[in-house]
């Protein structure tokens, strides 16, 4: 359910793992939108 949680979540270790996975899958993370979410887990970078 919460598979596409943003990197701004309380658990930073999970955020780091997700970022690494994002890089491994060759998927760019939306770092310019103030949110570091993997586009693979989020249909579109959620800007909030």
From Swiss-Prot:
Organism: Monophyllus redmani
Keywords noted in UniProt: Chromosome, Developmental protein, Differentiation, DNA condensation, DNA-binding, Nucleosome core, Nucleus, Spermatogenesis
Protein name per UniProt: Sperm protamine P1
Keyword Cell membrane included in the entry's annotation: no
Function recorded in the entry: Protamines substitute for histones in the chromatin of sperm during the haploid phase of spermatogenesis. They compact sperm DNA into a highly condensed, stable and inactive complex.
Family annotation (InterPro entries): Protamine_P1
GO-annotated molecular function: DNA binding
Entry similarity comment: Belongs to the protamine P1 family.
PROSITE patterns: PROTAMINE_P1
Gene name in the database record: PRM1
